[in-house]
Amino acid sequence: MYVFIFHVLAIKVGDVTDFTNFVNAVIDEASFDNCKGYIDRAKAASDAEVIFGGNCDKSVGYFVEPTVILTTNPKYESMAEEIFGPIITIYVYEDKDFVETLELCDSTSPYALTGAFFAYDLKAQRI
């Protein structure tokens, strides 16, 4: 997880006309408010926390800082819903729960947009 966060730290955010920026403002105020809502709820939740990012600024554009949410609940709302903003939610599963966690990725969203596995074990990555 720490390697992943290191890569998030390297993401450059700014104006769309600067092609060195990887993330720019979200499309409109409604999208900004939606992203901010997810972040605010994660900050207040007992089963989730914002471990990186979480800042939002709409003074010049609708900028949402790349944000990492860590949850202990595999069915936490941002695990099951497509946010359309620079927010990712991480659920760390126990090795013994791999099959059940894989099934969660397959069943959480009808659109299959929300699940991904990151693993050091090549066998796990092949499944």
Question: For the regions a protein language model found, what residue spans apply to each?
Answer:
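Conserved NAD(P)+-binding/catalytic subdomain of aldehyde/semialdehyde dehydrogenases
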Residues: 1
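Aromatic/hydrophobic pocket-lining residues that form π-stacking "cages" and hydrophobic walls in ligand
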Residues: 4, 38, 125-127
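Flexible, acidic loop-helix segments that line cofactor/substrate-binding pockets
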Residues: 5-37, 55-63, 77-85
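Residues within well-ordered alpha-helical secondary structure of globular protein domains
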Residues: 6, 41, 104-107
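Conserved C-terminal structural/oligomerization subdomain of aldehyde/semialdehyde dehydrogenase
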Residues: 12, 56, 63-127
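Helical element adjacent to the flavin cofactor pocket in flavoenzyme catalytic cores
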Residues: 37-45
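Short secondary-structure junctions
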Residues: 44-55
